[in-house]
Amino acid sequence: MTGEGRSAEQGIDMTKWLTGVKVAATAALVGLALAACSPKTETKTAAAPAAKTYTVGWTIYAGWMPWPYAEQAGIVKKWSDKYGVDIKVVQINDYVESLNQFTAGKLDAVTSTNMDALTIPAAAGKDTTFLMIGDYSNGNDGIVLKGGATLADIKGRPVNLVENSVSHYLLARGLESAGLKMTDVKVVNTSDADIVAAFGAPETKAVVPWNPQLTEIKKMPGAKQVFDSSKIPGEILDGLIISTEVAKANPNLAKALAGIWYETTMLMNQQDAAGQAAREAMAKLSGTDLAGYESQLKTTYLYYDPKAALAATISPDLVTANDKVRKFSFTAGLFGQGAKSVDDIGIEFPGGKILGDPKNVKLRFDPTYVQMAADGKL
């Protein structure tokens, strides 16, 4: 999905705090004679505790490859040094697992879609901030049939996808466009890491993947894409979410993350040797070549410039799109068993607009740091 929804088998070991303070023993002077023959001792200063390392998790998706590239290219270090924070960027092999780790506090920030930010950490009670909207899926997520011609042919088939992710949402929107319902298909939960292999199995009849897996599946025998996210522009958003508590306590971290992101995206958008080199590196990091990666970028409406991202963040369209997403999420039971209404979880937007319970805001779209980037104040 636009990364979307984009799940790792392994956890991450966080950097451990240094413990213990070294103290040198000091010999007592008993007299001038003893002092003259006794060995000298040095008094050591207690070591300062190590600075906290903030961990940012990412999974493979065209719109999220700037993060590992920024780490590789030294851009993360540059902005970390500027703001006096220690940032570690780590890959998680499974998208849903990355969000579970964020929810559990093992990651301070993570790449996510708007829907998954709502239905995983926010629904679990974790106050979450969408620090930056990076892109929206403009064809990066799709429904692919095996041996079918149109979306109507999906009726009665099992459909493999990352359950309860934006892939699930895309399927629902696609079915709606074809006059079908979710009860017309059977969802088979499949990790994003396994979905390409799953399509090759005889029993698999339909899948809903995102790039780069979508591109690979479309090349396979019998594959036919019958619907994609370009039909619902602006609804599947990808970006970086951060713990609201962490962001409030460490504004320099948020500033550094915004600086890292926009320096990297503006570089990759350059139509020169430097821009091409950045895109080539991102392609390699995502397991494809330059042509393959640039093909994926064509179906990713990426906000390379902070001014464009700011406009999207403060637009009324953001509220409209997320209203559709939250209604689907509640209907699908993704708010949890205790949720009684679509308004149980509050979502706050720029300007103070809130969808849902204003006393239980758990997802926030904060334009503060995008605004700083747009104003050149980072």
Map each language-model feature to its residues.
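Bacterial N-terminal signal peptides that target proteins for export
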Residues: D13-A25
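Bacterial signal peptide processing site
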Residues: S38-K40
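Pocket-lining segment of extracytoplasmic ligand-binding domains
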Residues: A193-L290
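C-terminal motif of bacterial Sec signal peptides marking the signal peptidase cleavage site
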Residues: A33-A36
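Short, glycine-/small- and polar/acidic-enriched structural segments
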Residues: A46-N189, K205-N211, G234, Q371, ...
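Short, Lys/Arg-enriched N-terminal segments with co-localized hydrophobic residues
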Residues: M1-D13
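Conserved C-terminal helix/tail region of periplasmic/extracytoplasmic solute-binding proteins
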Residues: R326-L378
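Secondary-structure end/capping motifs
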Residues: K248-G338
